[in-house]
A protein has these predicted regions:
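Alpha/beta-hydrolase fold nucleophile elbow
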Residues: 166-181
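Active-site machinery of serine-nucleophile hydrolases
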Residues: 90, 97-98, 102-154, 369, ...
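Classical eukaryotic N-terminal signal peptides for Sec-dependent ER targeting/secretion
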Residues: 1-12
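Short glycine-enriched nucleophile-adjacent loop
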Residues: 182-195, 201, 208
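Loop/turn elements at helix/coil->beta-strand transitions in domains of secreted/extracellular proteins
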Residues: 95-99, 128-132, 172-174, 196-199, ...
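C-terminal subdomain of alpha/beta-hydrolase-fold enzymes, centered on the catalytic histidine
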Residues: 276-519
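A catalytic-pocket lid/entrance helix-loop region that shapes and gates access to the active site
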Residues: 197-311, 319-322
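Catalytic-loop region of hydrolases
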Residues: 10, 14-134, 499, 503-520
Length: 520
């Protein structure tokens, strides 16, 4: 373990640094899933001073503040590390709530949007005269866990000294905890583990059900992508699986040349490459096109389905055309853009596991991989036989969980075994969890829908007045962004959330009295 003084230098930030073998998009290789987290509005993070509602000019909201948090909440003798947080007081009036977000598995300096009214956080603050905070998540591996992150939030809320008059502790002021994706799950887990610290909890696309085999990640894509594209993708995947699971080496070499230029990697590694074009679905938002964003997923489908000036029918063009078109698109986009200045086999499958032993600790991809390998799972695999699939069935728990974790952490895996997903669900409830004043919002088109409270694969989640569950026609955490109101169901849900929060805040004083009587 690093000495305490050095540890704090590493633990302050999630900023990834360049290391041998990384792709131009920061991933270790093409069979590592992109790390998606909180979505952002278009444009650079906001900077500069802001003006309070009373006309006072306040400090630059992009300036980070620093706060000491115990490295291990179970053994505080280990010392502390510095974490960064950002704050915006422009809407705050005495008595208003504190709207707090732990940004999860990211470098939080890019997430100051979440202390402005370009997000639901800021809209709540504007309506309720609240104070806005985003805090960076801890990053180092030995003490990187759900349980430690929950206590980080508690420790900050109970000990941070905010530059406003009055008592802003959670005993005297209502704190609203907001999170998305993993940090949305953390928000829900917080309600289960520490129900009386934060008054309101709001999880957007909260991935509350840990699953080792998460082939359902691709289900919302298959259900909602253009029918012709879906048909051709499924045809290509079925062909790739049939060939690679067979004995015709000539046919295998043909596929390897089409997608992997016959690089010296396994067939399952070649089959896994095709997910790269499918993964681009999660970059979509309701406003992507209108805001001039890149529609990479639809560019991929156009490459398959537009032949000259002719668009295929709903059943697609069929295997022969789709296979060649996909291979050509993959070569000129994914390989050409991501495998620059790197050996192709290394680009596809990474460097040997032993080279990962001394990897820098302040790497967000690796930090998040530690959490998935130890507590969540979520291997992005092919669907089982009998279920339609747009991903190769050669991608399994073996390739995408066991081998993946051993690649990143060879000193720990595979000896550790599978991720402790069942323990996580048992501890925090998964789909069965319930908490007072807990809001869930999920997207029907979100790749993470099947790990959320709106999963189609379960019927045990129930929306109630105290724990409302909304399903919008949006993507990953669309409800957090003000621009997403271009989609009517998102706009309606955002308005409902503002009304719900307002109603719950009106009950704050009576809640405090009830809590006092309980001796909490």
């Amino acid at each position: 373990m690093l000495p305490i003084g050095i540890w704090s230098l590493f633990a302050v930030t999630f900023t990834a640094i360049a290391v041998h073998g990384k792709l131009s998009d920061g991933r270790a290789h093409l069979n590592v899933p992109p790390r998606w987290s909180l979505p952002l509005p278009p444009g650079l993070p906001p900077t500069g001073p802001v003006t309070h509602v009373n006309g006072t000019v306040l400090a630059d909201i992009s300036t980070p503040h620093y706060f000491n948090i115990p490295i291990d909440h179970n053994n505080t003798s280990l010392g502390t590390f510095w974490t960064r947080y950002w704050v915006n007081y422009q809407y705050y009036e005495p008595g208003g709530p504190v709207i707090f977000m732990n940004t999860g598995e990211v470098n939080a300096e890019n997430y100051t949007h979440f202390i402005t009214n370009s997000t639901i956080n800021g809209l709540i603050a504007q309506q309720e005269s609240g104070l806005l905070i985003v805090m960076e998540h801890r990053d180092s591996l030995k003490y990187l866990s759900i349980e430690q992150a929950i206590q980080d939030n508690v420790y900050f809320a109970q000990n941070a000294k905010l530059l406003v008059p009055g008592n802003t502790s959670p005993d005297a002021t209502p704190w609203i905890l907001i999170g998305a994706s993993y940090s949305g799950a953390l928000t829900a887990f917080q309600k289960v583990a520490e129900p009386d610290v934060f008054y309101i909890h709001y999880g957007s696309s909260a991935v509350i059900e840990a699953q080792v085999d998460f082939h359902e990640y691709f289900t919302p894509i298959r259900q909602n992508m253009p029918a012709n594209c879906s048909a051709d993708v499924q045809a290509v995947i079925a062909h790739v699986d049939e060939v690679f699971m067979g004995t015709n080496t000539t046919a295998q070499t043909e596929i390897r040349n089409i997608f992997g230029r016959n690089a010296s990697v396994s067939n399952d590694a070649i089959a896994g490459l095709l997910r790269n074009n499918i993964w681009s679905w999660q970059t979509l938002q309701p406003f992507t096109a209108s805001a001039g964003g890149k529609l990479e997923f639809y560019e991929f489908c156009d490459a398959l389905e537009v032949n000259g000036r002719t668009v295929s029918g709903p059943k697609g063009w069929g295997l022969e055309h789709a296979l060649r078109a996909w291979g050509a698109y993959f070569s000129r986009t994914t390989v050409a853009k991501l495998c620059t200045d790197i050996d192709l086999a290394e680009c596809i499958n990474g460097t040997p596991a032993s080279s990962q032993d001394d990897h820098p600790v302040n790497d967000a991809d690796r930090s998040w991989s530690w959490q998935t390998c130890t507590q969540f799972g979520w291997g992005r695999t092919g669907a089982p036989k009998g279920t339609p699939t747009i991903v190769s069935r050669l991608r399994t728990v073996q390739t995408d969980v066991i081998d993946f974790c051993a690649y990143y952490f060879p000193k720990t895996f595979p000896a550790y075994g599978l991720p402790r997903a069942n323990e996580t669900n048992a501890r925090y409830g998964g789909w069965s969890m319930h908490g007072e004043r807990m809001i869930f919002v999920n997207g029907n088109y979100d790749t993470w829908r099947e790990a959320s409270m709106s999963a189609q694969q379960t019927n045990i989640t129930v929306s109630t007045a105290s724990q409302p569950i909304f399903l919008v026609n949006g993507f990953h955490s669309s409800d957090l962004l003000a621009l997403s109101a271009i989609e009517p169901t998102v706009a309606q849900t955002q308005n409902q959330i503002l009304n719900i929060v307002s109603g719950w805040l009106k009950d704050w004083e009576s809640y405090k009295e009830r809590r006092r009587r309980r001796g909490v």
